[in-house]
Amino acid sequence: MNEQTSRLNRERRFLVLLGLICLSLIGGALYMQVVLGEAPCPLCILQRYALLFIAVFAFIAAAMPGRRSLTFFEALVVLSAIGGIVAAGNHVYILANPMVSCGIDTLQPIVDDLPLAKLWPLAFQVDGFCSTPYPPILGLSLAQWALVAFVLTAVLVPLGIYRNRRQA
């Protein structure tokens, strides 16, 4: 096995791990929704979509045989993470400023009309308000943790690409 193949395999393992972490985060959100009764708002659902897109694109990227196709799907992972940053950042802003509403009247029908909301309503249908504060986990709200995860994804994936390919 040459050096370039070894580096690409390391990238693929990282992407599989990233996909599993994203699916675990969705599972944690579902646990909090079903067991702890924390109803998801439109921005929470959009963050779940971003996590799902990151996981799907990461798994597809890990299965790609060539470097070019791997890079294409890694770019889609980063774009999905940027979408998650927008949703989570907006949610963090709303939680910091409770007088601001997330627009439940305007966002809820749009989010509820997305295909996965009809296929799997438990996970992707809006039930709550964005301004509802829930108990923090290790000092941060769920939206803040999601923002951290999305920022790390948006930074670490391109950094890994650069690191693995600069000498290849």
From Swiss-Prot:
It is found in: Cell inner membrane. Residues 32-49, 90-144 are periplasmic. Residues 1-14, 66-72, 164-168 are cytoplasmic. The keyword Cell inner membrane applies. The keyword Cell inner membrane applies. The chain crosses the membrane at residues 15-31, 50-65, 73-89, 145-163. Belongs to the DsbB family. Required for disulfide bond formation in some periplasmic proteins. Acts by oxidizing the DsbA protein. NCBIfam families: PRK02110.1. This is Disulfide bond formation protein B 1.
